[in-house]
Amino acid sequence: MVVMLGPSGSAQFTVTSKAPGAIEVPADVLNAVDVPMHVTVTRDDGGAVLLAVAPSADARAILATSAVSTVSAVHYPAGSLDLRSSGTGALPDLARADIWRLTARGAGSAELLVDQGRAPETLVVTSGDATALKDVTVTLTWADHAWFFEALAMGTLGAVLAAFAFTDLWQGRVSNDPVVAGQPQSRRARA
């Protein structure tokens, strides 16, 4: 665990969506850990990207039956995400909606830091207009510097406990030699 987190104490997960449509990071992923999440989105064709965060009910309502790829699972320590596709409808112009609490735009890529203060929330990734996205890479990163030290402390504690257990087992093996009364020490050693 210490090696996986590294001194930065961060866990990073990535997926590339090949399906056209928006990408949704629901509350059970976005708000899974009580530390801010850093979201980076890169679009292969260099087109416009919009990241937007809204209360989950509002985000679900605006996406309705649109084509959406939803992050459905996070795999640690593999660092991957699963996507589940749903809907077939066209996307509304999400940029004009007044439901978004946080937004970030970019050409080819965009980044957003999502705090956990207003959970449950949903993150939506789109082109910013009605154009469907495809070949988009989403990277989610949670970072907490304390995680590294907590993992290091647990690893050290585990090593100390293992050393004590090994020592106890070794001493128990040596002291279980039967001592026969009346035999000299040298005979016991040969027997």
Where are these regions (language model features)?
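Glycine-centered flexibility motif
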Residues: 1, 119, 156-158
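Hydrophobic secretory-pathway targeting helix
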Residues: 1-7, 161-162
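Juxtamembrane interface at the cytosolic side of transmembrane helices
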Residues: 142-191
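Extracytoplasmic/periplasmic regions of membrane proteins
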Residues: 5-141
